[in-house]
Structure formats: C-alpha cells, structure tokens
C-alpha cells in the first residue's frame, strides 16, 4: 500500500476519487538502447554555420561536422563578421524512418584538452522536434544540460521519424555562438 502524507501545492489530489498524481523521474545507469547507424545521415538544413574554415581545421564551423563522427571537428554557428545569437538549429535527415529513444550531444572541447568542455557555446537548453516529411514537426522534448563533453538525453516517449531538428535556445555562459561536435541518436 501507498500512503500519501502530503503533496506540494501544485499537485492536485481529488478527495472524491481518492486519486493522486505522481511524477516519477528515472535514470538509466547504462543506456539500454542501440545506437542508430548514421551512415545514411545528412544535414538537411541549419540556421547558420561559419562559412570560413579555421586555419588548420577545414571542417570546423560547418554544419556537417555535427554528424561526421570526428570529435575534434564541430558545427559552430557563425562567429566571424555576423554573430547571430540563439536560437540556432540543425535538421538531420536519417535517410529512413527510425525509432528514437534519445540523443547524445557532444559539445566542443576546450582547445587545450579533449576531455574538458569549452567553457562557453555548448548547448545548455535545447528542443528536439521530429518529422516524417520535413514539413510538419512535433516537439518530443526540451532539455537542460550541464556543460559536459557528452550529454545523453532520453525522450519521455519513443518517437518514430525520418528527420529530427535540434534547436539550441541557450548556450553555456549565454554565448551568442552554438557549438556541437557530434550528434548521435539511439
């Protein structure tokens, strides 16, 4: 039996029905879902990218760097000349419909150590939307994450879609630029 001793003011309890509403958040100690093969993925669209290559790093700043499986490259929204602030978004075409349970977002590493996240620019708050046709979109999650090299986020309910869009609405240290080194789905 469950005994409810008290509830917070925003959690309604119906005395006539004897019903209580409980919200329980759980976590996984290890990810139980299989990674989705990214060999057929492509970047369908993006809000902005840095069009000029950084010396010695031809792909840094380009949107396709977010799915190139190379943690040393990254999608960086424009930082030379124009410096548009969030929201920044990237749309990925997985090539076919997939069952989605969550995502791993790898932020840009500090330039001097690959295990430490850059202090600013990595996603802090972002939305995930999915679509079957790249026209009608459904929001499947809004996430707030810490500044880690990798953040794993889980959807409340699985979703099936061909396309997904990640929209970063706030970055670490509230920087104008967004940096994502790698996006994986599971």
What is each residue range found by the language model?
Residues 4-6, 10-96, 108-121, 142, ...:
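Disordered, acidic Ser/Thr/Pro-rich linker "stalks" and the adjacent N-terminal cap
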Residues 1-12, 84-88, 98, 109-186:
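Trp- and acidic/polar-enriched beta-sheet ligand-binding modules for extracellular glycan
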Residues 105:
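Phosphate-coordinating loops and pocket residues in cytosolic domains that bind phosphorylated ligands
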